[in-house]
C-alpha cells in the first residue's frame, strides 16, 4: 500500500512539473535575408497572413510575430521572432501547413532557426 502511495505521489510530482514546463512561453527565431527587390513591407504582408493562420490553428491570440531588423551591424539580415504561450501551442503550428511557404520563399531566404525559453531575472533586494 505504501509503495502505491509513493508511486502515485512521485507520478503526480512529475506530471505537475511537466505541466509547468509546458506552460512557459517560448520564442522561435528565424534568421533571414530579403531577396533582391523585396521590402520589409513585402515580408510583413506575407507574415500577417501567417499570423492570422497561426492564431486560428494554435487557438491563441497570444501568438505574436515580429520583424526584427538590425540597428547596428550587418544591415542585410533580419529575424522573425515568433512567440507562443507554450510548447503545446507551438506544436499545433509546427504540425500544420499554412500553405504560405512559397510566398515566404518569394520574399526572403532564411538560413536557420532556434527555439528559446527565457527566464526572467528578478532584481536583487
Task: Enumerate the predicted regions with their spans.
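Bacterial N-terminal signal peptides that target proteins for export
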Residues: 1-10
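Glycine-rich beta-strand-turn "strand-cap" elements at beta-sheet edges
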Residues: 6, 22-27, 61-79, 100-125
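N-terminal signal peptide c-region/cleavage motif recognized by signal peptidases
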Residues: 18-20
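Short N-terminal segments immediately surrounding and downstream of signal-peptide cleavage
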Residues: 23-41
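Solvent-exposed beta-strand motifs enriched in subsets of small alpha/beta binding domains
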Residues: 31-32, 80-82
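Short amphipathic alpha-helical segments
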Residues: 38-64, 98-102
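Short amphipathic alpha-helices within nucleic acid-binding modules
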Residues: 40-42, 85-96
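Mature extracytoplasmic domains of secretory-pathway proteins
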Residues: 52-55, 75-77, 89-92
Amino acid at each position: 500500500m505504501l509503495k502505491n502511495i509513493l508511486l502515485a505521489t512521485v507520478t503526480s510530482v512529475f506530471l505537475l512539473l511537466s505541466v509547468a514546463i509546458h506552460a512557459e512561453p517560448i520564442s522561435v527565431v528565424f534568421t533571414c535575408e530579403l531577396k533582391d527587390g523585396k521590402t520589409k513591407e513585402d515580408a510583413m504582408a506575407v507574415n500577417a497572413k501567417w499570423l492570422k493562420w497561426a492564431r486560428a490553428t494554435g487557438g491563441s491570440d497570444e501568438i505574436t510575430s515580429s520583424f526584427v531588423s538590425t540597428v547596428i551591424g550587418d544591415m542585410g539580415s533580419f529575424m522573425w521572432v515568433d512567440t507562443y504561450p507554450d510548447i503545446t501551442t507551438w506544436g499545433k503550428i509546427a504540425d500544420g501547413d499554412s500553405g504560405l511557404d512559397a510566398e515566404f520563399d518569394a520574399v526572403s531566404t532564411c538560413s536557420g532557426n532556434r527555439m528559446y525559453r527565457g527566464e526572467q531575472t528578478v532584481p536583487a533586494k
